[in-house]
């Protein structure tokens, strides 16, 4: 099973960290589970310090969509468009959206 965990903002990582850790535990136990962490923002987002991920016990996102805009309509459109491409590139069985 391939699980995609989508986070749109920094606080979402705190909410979903227990889920990500459990997915990793299952994988280490030999269960057929893979995961991908997708972040809507940019890779060099200053709010995503390495310490955040080490404190939460999870890895940094695997994919950064690079959405960086202020207008809500533009933001929504860019996230939908770029996430669709991401899912086409990385087939997924389950999507967990954290908001």
Segments and roles (model prediction):
Residues 1:
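Nucleotide donor/acceptor-binding cores
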Residues 4-7, 12-22, 28, 52, ...:
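Active-site and donor-binding regions of nucleotide-sugar-utilizing enzymes
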Residues 31-75:
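Conserved nucleotide-sugar phosphate-binding/catalytic loop shared by glycosyltransferases and other
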């Amino acid at each position: 099973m391939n699980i995609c965990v989508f986070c749109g903002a920094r606080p979402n990582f705190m909410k979903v960290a227990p889920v990500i850790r459990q997915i990793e535990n299952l994988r280490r136990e030999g269960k057929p589970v893979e995961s991908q962490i997708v972040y809507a923002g940019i890779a060099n987002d200053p709010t995503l310090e390495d310490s955040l991920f080490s404190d939460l016990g999870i890895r940094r996102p695997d994919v950064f969509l690079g959405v960086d805009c202020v207008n809500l309509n533009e933001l929504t459109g860019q996230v939908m468009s770029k996430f669709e491409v991401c899912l086409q590139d990385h087939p997924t069985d389950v999507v967990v959206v954290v908001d």
